[in-house]
């Protein structure tokens, strides 16, 4: 049995050596043809694949032999380049600090528009006919006859029901339209989120550590007494001394929620469960009531606390990572473009971006597959040499 294994291993090693010899000795179009044929043969041999995988696994986390073989004087120059890279990261950090200052400046310019949005949503201000005029995209245009029919239908519906104030359930609809947020919203959260009037972002003052606060403004409701719920995100825009090359712009370092003053019996983040326990000796049964945590959007305001040593278990790390993503998404996308998420247009744009990338990849894959599966395909007829893509 050992002889058979040794023989198979020798054959595998020989096959791998054949690949290396083809690369070293052959040149030109003939090399490409033979390499392609040999690659196909190897990919169909599970033993060769296993041997290749073993070799690749051995290369993980190991420096390239070329760098290790460089003369000492060259390595010194490489170190000089690394020091330049650190200085680049420090300049980049200053750049992002100025970007944060610009965000603070332009937030003041955006605010009157967001205030008007708030007033329209909450029936404080009724927009004029001119403000309500909107020219649809060409693809959305319909005939005058259909427009008139739709107008009559709308008028009938308006007569049948009471005139709604503002835009009902605006923010709840936004949340339900976005997968990242709808996953957080439970059925018992929806009656509360119907009372959400506005979401604002406030940036830290000039000269203060970089941070931003999300403010959720609620109208009086039967669930809690808070008028505003807040979530504060602390950020850092400087390279880490222990790993300066990992710097890629500002990062969220931590977050703090707020206490929700729930009215009696209205805390949706907790639920009461009842368990029956049977006494081993007497056989009597008793019912035990226990309060446990409950899935809810409002857990967003009670993130895991990061201990002083910074060590978190896997669950807490996953929760915080998702929390940071949600906070960033609310700040960068939802608050500035909420109406487009309400109508679904922003979601369609996002989907189109992903679809286009996916379609391009699919088309490339189909073309490659068609060539290999075509019995009349002759690689020699392909006169265009493979391009070398430099990253």
UniProtKB/Swiss-Prot annotation:
Residues 389-391 form a propeptide. The modification Phosphoserine is found at residues 10, 69, 143. The modification Phosphothreonine is found at residues 62, 64. A motif (Nuclear localization signal) lies at residues 273-279. A motif (NAP1L motif) lies at residues 125-150. Pfam families: NAP. Residues 11-28, 131-143, 346-376 have a biased composition (Acidic residues). Highly expressed in the brain (at protein level). High expression in cerebral cortex, not in cerebellar cortex. It is found in: Nucleus; Cytoplasm; Melanosome. Polyglycylated by TTLL10 on glutamate residues, resulting in polyglycine chains on the gamma-carboxyl group. Both polyglutamylation and polyglycylation modifications can coexist on the same protein on adjacent residues, and lowering polyglycylation levels increases polyglutamylation, and reciprocally. GO terms for biological process: nervous system development; nucleosome assembly; positive regulation of neural precursor cell proliferation; positive regulation of neurogenesis. The modification 5-glutamyl polyglycine is found at residues 359-360. The modification N-acetylalanine is found at residue 2. Keywords: Acetylation, Cytoplasm, Isopeptide bond, Lipoprotein, Methylation, Neurogenesis, Nucleus, Phosphoprotein, Prenylation. Residues 1-32, 131-163, 346-391 are annotated as: Disordered. Belongs to the nucleosome assembly protein (NAP) family. Histone chaperone that plays a role in the nuclear import of H2A-H2B and nucleosome assembly. Also participates in several important DNA repair mechanisms: greatly enhances ERCC6-mediated chromatin remodeling which is essential for transcription-coupled nucleotide excision DNA repair. Also stimulates homologous recombination (HR) by RAD51 and RAD54 which is essential in mitotic DNA double strand break (DSB) repair. Plays a key role in the regulation of embryonic neurogenesis. Promotes the proliferation of neural progenitors and inhibits neuronal differentiation during cortical development. This is Nucleosome assembly protein 1-like 1. The gene is Nap1l1.
